[in-house]
Regions:
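A short, charge-rich alpha-helical start-of-domain segment used by transcription regulators
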Residues: 7-29, 125
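DNA-recognition helix of helix-turn-helix
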Residues: 80, 133, 138-139, 143-172
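Arg/Lys-rich amphipathic alpha helix in sigma70-family domain 2
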Residues: 56-63, 72-92
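C-terminal flanking helix
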Residues: 26, 30, 51, 125, ...
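Amphipathic, Lys/Arg- and hydrophobic-enriched alpha-helical face
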Residues: 22-40, 57, 117, 166-169
Length: 172
């Protein structure tokens, strides 16, 4: 496990090893948070919280297990917690929440990502982004989400089909 080497270095006092842990997991953490929260700023907040929790709890990580899955699980739990809190606080005023009423700010990640965020459920979006943007294998994603590989594959294929159908409807 590549991350284990850096975790061990960090535990032994090499603070620069955390940079490598961050660089190797940041895209995954971001896209998992984004898939749950559907908000870039909140996803970035979850990233900060996630890495603070990783720093705080790195001593409890068991070397030899899947470090990526451990970090992704923390991010997923933090995003779910934030979503629950936001749902309780969410205003239904049209002017305060334009995104709820169909008006979105332009997304720097592209129209296709916007379309995927709108069409896909949380798992489908997470899996799609982890495969396409982060380069994870379905087996790795299955471990991250405690999901059988055939289920990951099905959700990935389903996400692609939904996107293809939507693009065909729009004339692409």
């Amino acid at each position: 496990m590549a991350l284990d080497k850096f975790i061990k270095k960090f535990i032994n006092g090499d603070a620069s090893a955390f940079d490598e842990i961050y660089n190797r997991t940041r895209k995954s953490v971001y896209y998992v948070a984004l898939s749950i929260l559907r908000d870039k700023a909140l996803a970035e907040d979850v990233m900060q919280i996630t890495y603070m929790r990783v720093l705080k709890n790195i001593q409890s990580y068991t070397l030899g297990t899947n470090a990526s899955a451990w970090i992704i699980k923390i991010a997923k739990n933090e995003a779910i917690n934030m979503k629950k809190v936001r749902m309780r606080e969410q205003s239904v005023d049209e002017y305060e929440n334009l995104a709820l009423f169909g008006v979105n700010e332009p997304d720097t990640y592209g129209e296709l990502t916007d379309l995927a965020k709108r069409l896909l459920d949380d798992d489908e979006f997470s899996i799609l982004m982890l495969v396409t943007a982060c380069g994870y294998k379905r087996k790795e994603i299955g471990k991250m989400f405690d999901m059988p590989i055939p289920t990951v594959t099905w959700k990935y294929q389903n996400a692609l089909l939904k996107l293809r159908n939507a693009l065909e409807k729009e004339g692409y």
